[in-house]
């Protein structure tokens, strides 16, 4: 088997969104699984729209999710001399030509074609032009597309694709200012980089016949193509920012783990049996672009949150502390190691993201200043207040290093007073945490410690 070489080639005109990252992941997995090469190429030939910040954001996203590329990043803006050489080569071999048609002439031609209900297109009028060029016109360079031929390729996702060259006009490969066009530079770079397999979005499917024309004109080897359907929202519409089409780095800020995001995106358009959770090693062992789905996949926040919660639960306390550093939450330095372990172990089971986990840390460690109204209103204060007063005294005698002792103290109140557990547990929870839900009460008491637990009960009794 020949060396597999893939690439990811974004344009730095905006942030890297999840559709782009998914494409990068597919290319990365295919190359790495086959001990091949994976390159990053920045397609920055549109100098008016390029953004250094966008290019840096792409690199930053790669670093975060752990996609390591081979060699140096290739910037197309540094390769204009190479492109000019190949444009000249095509001109010298009479495979391309200068077209002197003005924009006004081209617009007029298109209007005439529309009036005749024809597809607007350039009519190849300068294809065999031998006369004197008109003055004042900076020409473009067009490729001579072979006529009456069928361009066919077997797409790894779409299957057999055939296009008659008569449907293509002699498309532009160099603008009037000499800058090369997208399809031209992509073809040159893919060929010179030795790209064997191109995995990209199916919005590029219409570009492929044009690129094959160029491959053949330059006697380059044509790579394998895999055109992946786009990601849709759960209503079957194009992704909007609200539905997930946002900067990849925003997911880090929202508290998603890179392992969860990579797993999630790899499953959008690819599957293996009914398995949902994949480590990177499993993805490398199982991924094959031939298994990519031909129908669009749907972005599901529910699925992403479920996966993230799964990965969150499997993080150690030390790993969680590292991951939580970018987020704002209460100081943990007053907790002993055992309390810290209990806090994070309890909360990671109840959190879907790091951001949510940070908020839940605050919910436990910051004393409530108000209490959940609907729960408070249901309390029988004549019964509750004496119970909490009695329990406060028990806590002063309790061993807070032993969770079972704390549990026994709560059970003792319930048994002595001959009441239902909820009649005591609910007001105690409200006193400690300010709301009717949250972590277990023995956990809360253990984490807060004697002094803080007693103080919170006293504050509640004053209300």
Swiss-Prot record:
It catalyses: tRNA(Glu) + L-glutamate + ATP = L-glutamyl-tRNA(Glu) + AMP + diphosphate. Its main location: cytoplasm. One of its GO terms (cellular component) is cytosol. GO terms for molecular function: ATP binding; glutamate-tRNA ligase activity; tRNA binding; zinc ion binding. PROSITE patterns: AA_TRNA_LIGASE_I (PS00178). The keyword Transferase does not apply. GO terms for biological process: glutamyl-tRNA aminoacylation. Keywords: Aminoacyl-tRNA synthetase, ATP-binding, Cytoplasm, Ligase, Nucleotide-binding, Protein biosynthesis. Its EC number is 6.1.1.17. It comes from the Bacteria. A motif ('HIGH' region) lies at residues 10-20. Pfam families: Anticodon_2 (PF19269), tRNA-synt_1c (PF00749). ATP binds at residue 241. The keyword ATP-binding applies. It is found in: Cytoplasm. InterPro entries: aa-tRNA-synth_I_cd-bd, aa-tRNA-synth_I_codon-bd_sub2, aa-tRNA-synth_I_CS, aa_tRNA-synth_I_cd-bd_sf, Glu-tRNA-ligase_bac/mito, Glu/Gln-tRNA-synth, Glu/Gln-tRNA-synth_Ib_cat-dom, GluQ/Sye. A motif ('KMSKS' region) lies at residues 238-242. Monomer. Belongs to the class-I aminoacyl-tRNA synthetase family. Glutamate--tRNA ligase type 1 subfamily. Catalyzes the attachment of glutamate to tRNA(Glu) in a two-step reaction: glutamate is first activated by ATP to form Glu-AMP and then transferred to the acceptor end of tRNA(Glu). This is Glutamate--tRNA ligase 1. It comes from Helicobacter pylori (strain ATCC 700392 / 26695). The lineage of its organism: Bacteria, Pseudomonadati, Campylobacterota, Epsilonproteobacteria, Campylobacterales. The gene is gltX1.
